[in-house]
Amino acid sequence: MAVFEKVQEIIVEELGKETEEVTLETTFDDLDADSLDVFQVISEIEDAFDIQIETEEGLNTVGDLVAYVEEKSK
């Protein structure tokens, strides 16, 4: 499974959103995610990809998060 699809799946599951709502351009504000929601999503992504996400700064969109995961997974 590609990184985007897995990240999308986690966001849909954790935030109760529809798959179509989660695109690379979607922001966490667009998803009505508060800081606890973002923390939970990041925690699930860390577990799924076996990485540590050092900071949430600069991770404004789903695309930012996907790019970060791809870089850390190398």
Curated annotation (Swiss-Prot):
Its main location: cytoplasm. InterPro entries: ACP, ACP-like_sf, PP-bd_ACP. The modification O-(pantetheine 4'-phosphoryl)serine is found at S35. The keyword Membrane does not apply. GO terms for cellular component: cytosol; membrane. It is found in: Cytoplasm. Residues 1-73 form the Carrier domain. Gene3D superfamilies: ACP-like. Carrier of the growing fatty acid chain in fatty acid biosynthesis. Coiled coil: none annotated. Pfam families: PP-binding. GO terms for biological process: lipid A biosynthetic process. This is Acyl carrier protein. It comes from Streptococcus pyogenes serotype M1. The gene is acpP. Belongs to the acyl carrier protein (ACP) family. PANTHER family: ACYL CARRIER PROTEIN (PTHR20863:SF62). The keyword Nucleotide-binding does not apply. One of its GO terms (molecular function) is acyl carrier activity. Keywords: Cytoplasm, Fatty acid biosynthesis, Fatty acid metabolism, Lipid biosynthesis, Lipid metabolism, Phosphopantetheine, Phosphoprotein. Pathway: Lipid metabolism; fatty acid biosynthesis. It comes from the Bacteria. 4'-phosphopantetheine is transferred from CoA to a specific serine of apo-ACP by AcpS. This modification is essential for activity because fatty acids are bound in thioester linkage to the sulfhydryl of the prosthetic group.
